[in-house]
UniProtKB/Swiss-Prot annotation:
Binding site for substrate: 133-135, 170, 177-179, 230, 291, 297-300
Annotated active site: 135
Family label: Belongs to the phosphofructokinase type A (PFKA) family. Mixed-substrate PFK group III subfamily.
NCBIfam families tied to this protein: PRK03202.1
SUPFAM superfamilies, A to Z: Phosphofructokinase
Protein name: ATP-dependent 6-phosphofructokinase
Cited function: Catalyzes the phosphorylation of D-fructose 6-phosphate to fructose 1,6-bisphosphate by ATP, the first committing step of glycolysis.
Organism: Propionibacterium freudenreichii subsp. shermanii (strain ATCC 9614 / DSM 4902 / CIP 103027 / NCIMB 8099 / CIRM-BIA1)
Length: 373
């Protein structure tokens, strides 16, 4: 009897999602004769049992398209808002899994999806994940699909900002996505020739940044471009966040943990305008006009680049191979040119940050890029 498999996309949208759906789906249907259904709008669609058939026709023509044909959401399976109340929907999801006679569930997503998938796996469902996020911050995989496209978009933005910064003798700060990891800002900063790159992993000192910019001015370069990761913080704010993180780790009960998480969210919210604050501080310190550009969601949109299409296809087809072999409870990780399974417990709840001695950081420093430290 052929296997019946469900697939969904969860968390933020990302270039390459449709390519991964296609890669898994075509291999599952054509190579292994599986029946494939796609749940709409992520975990919420799974809880509400909303799905569509994914046959060869539905999987055609989506390789190059952005977004996700299935829709997505950021719902947590154990804390989902339903009818005005936060409810644990894992029992409902398991009933739908059994009602649809699924042999496996494939979840495409990032860190939050890995945690959701681990909960479903622990509840007795056969689950695998494919690593999707422009942040490139998942543990256990060399790269996530979506990152390469976002890197191209962010690099193009940094390129373009050079000419306007030069023309008006300004400091231009461009805020780049990445959540609490600096991979995207670091890559775009290097590729775009940013003069300063600010990362979550390297708390910055405003005086150090101002001094680097002033040195450029003294040598005739009366402009600077600063690539700012959205999670970058000055030394004081970074210490405040670290203390809030410690409270979450040390919480000894669910109630204490929820309270600590709320405190951490409030601390993070108080830093929301950090790039604008930094621009004001640099303008005062250097005498140069400062402007801020927030790249925002443009980094997640549009058609995936060739590299992401290849990676999504490799991971998708490898996922179909694993399902056919009965390998579950894993993320399909990119390793070299191929893929291999990594247990979900090694991925869920963890963040792959940029090591401060990473070759990219060393290379950037050797070409004169500052990091504000």
């Amino acid at each position: 009897m052929s296997m019946r498999v469900g697939i969904l996309t969860s968390g933020g949208d990302s270039p390459g999602l449709n390519a991964a759906i296609r890669g898994f789906g075509k291999a599952a249907v054509s190579t292994y004769g599986m029946e494939l259904i796609g749940f709409r709008d992520g975990m919420r669609g799974l809880a509400e049992n909303r799905f569509m058939q994914l046959d060869s026709h539905a999987l055609s023509g989506i390789l190059t398209t952005g977004g996700t044909i299935l829709g997505t959401s950021r719902d947590k399976v154990h804390k989902m808002l339903v009818d005005g109340k936060v409810q644990n929907m894992i029992p409902v999801i398991k009933k739908n899994y059994e009602k649809n006679k699924l042999d496996a569930l494939v979840c495409l997503g990032g860190g939050g999806t890995a945690k959701n998938a681990k909960r479903l796996s622990d509840a007795g469902m056969n689950v695998i994940t494919l690593p999707k996020t422009i942040d490139n911050d998942l543990v256990g995989t060399d790269q996530t699909f979506g990152f390469a496209t976002a890197l191209e978009i962010a690099t193009d933005a940094v390129d373009r900002l050079h000419s306007t910064a030069h023309s008006h003798h300004r400091i231009i700060l461009t805020e780049i996505m990445g959540h609490r990891a600096g991979w995207l800002a670091l890559g775009a900063g290097i590729a775009g020739g940013a003069d300063v790159i600010l990362l979550p992993e390297v708390p910055y000192n405003v005086e150090s940044i101002a001094a680097a910019i002033s040195r450029r001015s003294a040598h005739g370069s009366n402009f600077s471009v600063v690539a700012v990761a959205e999670g970058a913080r000055n030394e004081r704010d970074a210490a405040e966040l670290a203390a809030a993180d410690a409270l979450v780790r040390e919480a000894d009960s669910p109630v204490a943990r929820d309270a600590a998480k709320t405190h951490r969210a409030n601390v993070e919210a108080s830093h929301r305008a950090h790039t604008f604050t930094l621009a004001t501080e640099l303008e005062k310190a250097t005498g140069l006009e400062s402007r801020v550009t927030i790249l925002g969601y443009v980094q997640r949109g549009g058609t995936p680049c060739g590299r992401d299409r290849v990676l999504a296809t490799v991971l998708g087809t490898a996922g179909a191979d694993l399902v056919a072999k009965g390998v579950f409870g894993v993320m399909v990780a990119a390793k070299g040119d191929g893929a291999e399974p990594v247990p979900l417990e090694e991925v869920a709840g963890k963040i792959r940050r940029v090591p401060v001695d990473h070759p990219w950081i060393r290379a950037a420093k050797e070409v004169g890029t500052g990091f504000g430290d």
